[in-house]
């Protein structure tokens, strides 16, 4: 019940900002705010020592099976600095009922066997080349929004959070406020994903960039423009953003990474 009420509160909080955020995003060319209503399975994987390339090759071999089953390929990228995992995979599910429907399970099994790498064999190989895995099921933007964000990008930044008790709703609002600031200062809109079940994280944001320079620099704007953007987002000043966010969280991790070719 706690998980359900938390998710419901966060999603309801979205509507209090949705109109304003959609307008701000459309004015600056970013995507409109999207209700977190599409289910994804997020997997973080750490390779066994010396097995990173084997791990990547194994997942690449699995992609054809995902296509054949009708599930669609997971969106994934490789860590370069930050947390302890090596790969992040974002698997589209839509909903539990859709993903675990009997016909979908049967198609998934048939596609795996036809590929020459059964589900059981894939699991054995995955265990052999990974040190640990962590799964979290999250509600996020529509699949087409996420796919579009990944198009033409090669550098990624995830911020992942455990909120302080009772601060989940306020943290979600703060993330959306930062999105207004980002769009106003010429940066990409960070997609927000809210925990449904699984690992301890309450939510994460994912930003997609052309390259590391795009992430590090953004558009050149004046100090006055940054101040105006912060006020529009609901902050008193740009200097307030980080300290305010830290009043809401128990734990926060940043990880950067690159596209997998």
Predicted regions and their residues:
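N-terminal secretory signal peptides that target proteins for export/translocation
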Residues: 1-6
């Amino acid at each position: 019940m706690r998980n359900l009420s938390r998710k419901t509160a966060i999603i309801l909080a979205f509507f209090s900002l949705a109109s304003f955020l959609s307008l701000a995003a459309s004015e600056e060319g970013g995507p409109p705010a999207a209700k977190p209503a599409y289910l994804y399975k997020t997997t973080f994987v750490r390779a066994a020592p010396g097995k990173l390339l084997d791990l990547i090759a194994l997942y690449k071999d699995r992609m054809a099976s995902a296509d054949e089953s009708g599930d669609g390929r997971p969106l994934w990228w490789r860590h370069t600095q930050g947390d302890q995992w090596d790969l992040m995979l974002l698997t589209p599910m839509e909903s539990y009922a859709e993903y675990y429907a009997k016909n979908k399970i049967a198609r998934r099994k048939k596609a795996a066997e036809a590929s020459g790498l059964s589900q059981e064999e894939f699991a054995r190989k995955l265990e052999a080349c990974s040190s640990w895995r962590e799964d979290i099921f999250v509600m996020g933007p529509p699949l087409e929004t996420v796919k579009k964000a990944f198009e033409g990008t090669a550098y990624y930044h995830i911020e992942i959070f455990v909120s302080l008790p009772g601060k989940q709703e306020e943290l979600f609002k703060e993330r959306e406020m930062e999105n207004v600031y980002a769009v106003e200062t010429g940066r990409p809109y960070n997609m927000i994903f809210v925990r449904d079940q699984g690992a301890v994280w309450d939510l994460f944001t994912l930003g997609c960039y052309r390259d590391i320079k795009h992430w590090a620099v953004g558009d050149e704007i004046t100090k006055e423009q940054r101040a105006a953007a912060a006020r529009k987002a609901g902050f008193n000043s740009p200097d307030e953003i980080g300290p305010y966010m830290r009043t809401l969280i128990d734990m926060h991790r940043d990880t950067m990474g690159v596209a997998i070719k």
